[in-house]
Amino acid sequence: MSDLPSSFDNGNSIDENEKSPGYYKILERCKEQPLVPLGCLATCGALILSARALRVGNKRQANRMFFARVAFQGLTVAALIGGAMYYGQDPKQKLEQKEREKMLARHREKLWIEELERRDLEVQERRKRAAAFRQQEEEK
């Protein structure tokens, strides 16, 4: 790889999520389907409480928490499926996403062509300087 930074590295990208850390994507998904993280937290809470009840020796409480854990897992899976069905049924949203992807691809292609043209100009300038240098050396 080249030590020189690419012109793509200047932050002109249309897709800001491309450079964002993973937790922004997680937050975005949580906003889209808020029941899934709540179900995960409830499942973890029930699991922790069941482990605590087992440690104390309260078998009845542990069994209730195991049952609650299974119920919360089921509700979480149902929320996942429901969210997938809800977001999967919107063809307009899919069409908009495809259009955004096409626009992003065209933008990236344009940036790549500009980058290639810029590099080509740099190579031509280097060749001109090298030819001028050689000509100066020959004159000496």
Curated annotation (Swiss-Prot):
UniProt domain HIG1: residue ranges: 7-98
Entry keywords, A to Z: Membrane, Mitochondrion, Transmembrane, Transmembrane helix
Transmembrane spans: 35-54, 66-88
PROSITE patterns in the record: HIG1 (PS51503)
GO cellular component, one term: respiratory chain complex
A Pfam short name: HIG_1_N
Membrane topology: Multi-pass membrane protein
Recorded family membership: Belongs to the RCF1 family.
Function, as annotated: Cytochrome c oxidase subunit which plays a role in assembly of respiratory supercomplexes.
Name of this chain's protein: Respiratory supercomplex factor 1, mitochondrial
Gene behind the chain: RCF1
